[in-house]
C-alpha cells in the first residue's frame, strides 16, 4: 500500500509492505543431531557423544509441531524527486516475532549457566523478538560534465555489481547480508541486503562505455542466525556467541573502494563488465589463541580479514525471453 504526492517543486511517494508469516517444524528432533545428556522439559535421547562438537541447542529449542517463527513485519519507503535532478530515498524495516522465543525449555549438556532456561541468551532473545533498522538513506544529484550525464549518490546505499545477486562470494562483495532474514518466509531481497554509507559516482563515457566508482566510509558485517534459533547450526556464530566463549573483532572502517567499467559494443547484445575492488570480509574467520600451553586454555576470536583485493569480469546477453549472465572473479 502507498500513496503519491506532488507540489510545484516536489514529487514523492510513500510505500509500505506489511507481511505476516509463520514457520512450523514438521519433524521431531533427530537423535543423530543431538548430544547425549540434554536436560529439561521432555528432553530427548541424544545419539552423539558429548565430544562430538555438534552444537545442538538450536535443534533442541523447537520440537515437532512447534512454530519457530510467527511474525509480523513491515518495510516502508519514501522517495522524493526535487528540481535540479535531486533525489532522496529512505527505507526502513521492522519485524516482531511472536514465536521464535517460545522454546521447549530443553537444554544441551553444555549450555552455559548464563543462558536462560529457554535455551536463549539475552542477546539472542532480543535479536529474535524484535528488530527495527534503517536500510537505505541517500541523496543523489545528476549533472552534466563534458556532454555526459553524471550521477553522484551519498549515504546508506547498495552497490549491485556482477551477475550474481543471490550467491555470496562473487563480484557482488560490496554488500553485507542478513542471513536470518533470507531464511524467513515471505522476505524480499531488498530487506536482506544491508546498505552501507558510501559515496558513489557513475557516468557514461560515450561509445557504450559507462564507469562507476565508490568509496565506503564505514564497514558493516553480515548477520547470521542467533545462537539457539531454529536456523542456527553453531554456538560460535551469531548473537549469543559470547555466552559460549567466542569473541569478535570488527574490521576497520577505512580502506574500502571499488571501480567498475561496463561496455556494450555497437550492434551487439552482449554487455561486458570489468571490476576492481578493495574490501573487508563481511563473514569472519576463526583465530584461536592458546593462553596456556600446559592446559591448552584457548581464546577463540572471530576476525574479519581486511584489505582484500578482487578483480572480476562479467558478461550478459538476452537469448529470446531469457537473460543470461556469467562472471569470473579472482582474489590474490
Please report, for each region that a protein language model flagged, where it lies by residue.
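Transmembrane beta-strand segments of Gram-negative outer membrane beta-barrel proteins
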Residues: 5-54, 61-62, 88, 92
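Outer-membrane beta-barrel channels and translocator barrels
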Residues: 9, 81-85, 144-148, 194, ...
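Residues that define the transmembrane beta-barrel architecture of outer-membrane proteins
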Residues: 10, 54, 58, 66-74, ...
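Transmembrane beta-strands of outer-membrane beta-barrel proteins
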Residues: 12-20, 88-90, 150-154, 211-213, ...
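Residues on the lipid-exposed face of transmembrane beta-strands in outer-membrane beta-barrel proteins
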Residues: 16, 74-80, 90, 136-141, ...
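Transmembrane beta-strands of outer-membrane beta-barrel pores
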Residues: 20-26, 94-98, 102, 156-160, ...
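Outer membrane beta-barrel
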Residues: 84-233
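Long, internal scaffold/assembly segments composed of regular secondary structure
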Residues: 247-332
